[in-house]
């Protein structure tokens, strides 16, 4: 069958980098591929059920973003813990806390710890990125009386903390490799969404930047929070803090709808609002090596039939001759791809 003109087609898959590996998710199925210390690739496939599987409330615009955000944190934490097990020094001994939790919860101690870790992560993120900028801006109350200017300063501080955090952790060796796997994840998705057979060569030529990336989502969270906090104000300092906490679900819901729209559209407005988040991905993704791409490809193939996808979306069947290096590959489009 004749091949259709190539353009980006939404695939529905997404994922994240984990320690020495990549997690890919397609609908309820997800796979975690890990490069073990001996060089072999371990692939685990499972089904993830959200907080309210099948419930209509998780489909309602703006509300769905809240549930999606929580589910992403839960799954992400689970996959990172799974990948960490491959690089622990020997078998980790079960602690007294583990035994006590298992006894009390009927063997659900690991899930309880995972839930606690997720909640703690959210609390720390709120403290650092929401409450700290507000507190620092209040230190200027004696010098600046204009509430609008203080709101702008709070937003600038929030952006500065966000950028400093990204830059600081990128200097860590392990995080640098995590960012390389992050780039591998993006390259694989961009490769198939551009209509190319998923090979190491084709993936390497694809962009490591993607519009549906979590980095872009976090940028929208910061941006939306600045706008909401600027226009929605109260005079009481305690109420100001409570208001910022109460608006977090609203911020997450709005940000999710923006990035969801960005992943399905490509008009000039979408490109403009997506640009800052995609620029930030220059910091949170790095160029992967071929072995990292092999891991990412294994993860994709465990949950997604990319050959059937190419046939349905681009109108051609993949044969073995196309799987050779350079087959159906365009020039590198670094910085222009979408996740």
List each language-model region with its residue ranges.
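Membrane interface segments of multi-pass transport proteins and intramembrane proteases
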Residues: 98-108, 135-153, 232-242, 261-271, ...
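Polar-ligand-bearing catalytic/cofactor-coordination segments
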Residues: 2-14, 18, 22-24, 144, ...
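Cytosolic juxtamembrane amphipathic/interface segments immediately preceding
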Residues: 4-18, 53-59, 98-114, 200-206
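Juxtamembrane "helix exit" motif at the C-terminal ends of alpha-helical transmembrane segments
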Residues: 82, 121-146, 221-245, 252, ...
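Residue-level signature of transmembrane alpha-helical entry/exit and packing/kink sites
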Residues: 110, 114, 118, 150-158, ...
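Multi-pass alpha-helical transmembrane bundle typical of ion/small-solute transporters
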Residues: 48-49, 53-56, 65-69, 76-94, ...
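Select subsegments of transmembrane alpha-helices in polytopic membrane proteins
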Residues: 113-129, 210-221
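Divalent-cation
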Residues: 1-88, 92
């Amino acid at each position: 069958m004749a091949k259709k003109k190539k353009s980006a087609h939404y695939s529905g898959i997404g994922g994240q980098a984990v320690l020495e590996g990549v997690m890919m998710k397609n609908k309820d199925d997800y796979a975690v591929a890990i490069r073990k210390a001996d060089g072999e690739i371990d692939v685990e496939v499972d089904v993830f059920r959200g907080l309210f599987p099948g419930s209509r409330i998780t489909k309602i615009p703006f509300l769905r973003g809240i549930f999606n955000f929580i589910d992403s944190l839960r799954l992400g934490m689970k996959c990172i813990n799974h990948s960490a097990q491959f690089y622990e020094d020997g078998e980790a001994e079960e602690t007294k806390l583990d035994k006590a939790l298992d006894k009390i919860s009927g063997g659900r101690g690991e899930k309880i710890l995972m839930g606690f870790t997720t909640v703690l992560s959210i609390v720390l993120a709120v403290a650092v990125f929401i409450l700290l900028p507000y507190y620092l801006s209040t230190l200027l109350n004696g010098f600046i009386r204009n509430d609008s200017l203080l709101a702008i300063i709070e937003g600038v501080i929030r952006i500065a903390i966000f950028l400093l955090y990204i830059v600081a952790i990128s200097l860590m060796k392990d995080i640098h490799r995590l960012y390389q796997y992050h780039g591998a994840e993006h390259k694989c998705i961009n490769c198939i969404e551009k209509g190319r057979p998923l090979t190491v060569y084709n993936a390497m030529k694809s962009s490591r930047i993607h519009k549906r990336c979590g980095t872009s989502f976090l940028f929208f969270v910061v941006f939306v929070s600045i706008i909401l906090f600027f226009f929605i104000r109260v005079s009481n300092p305690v109420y100001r803090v409570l208001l910022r906490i109460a608006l977090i679900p609203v911020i997450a819901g709005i940000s999710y709808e923006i990035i969801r729209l960005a992943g399905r559209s490509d008009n000039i407005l979408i490109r403009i609002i997506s640009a800052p988040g995609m620029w930030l991905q220059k910091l949170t993704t790095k160029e992967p090596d071929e072995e990292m791409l092999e891991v990412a490809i294994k993860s994709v193939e465990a949950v997604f039939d990319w050959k059937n996808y190419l046939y349905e979306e681009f109108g051609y069947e993949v044969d073995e001759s196309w799987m050779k290096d350079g087959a159906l590959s365009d020039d590198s489009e670094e910085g222009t791809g979408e996740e």
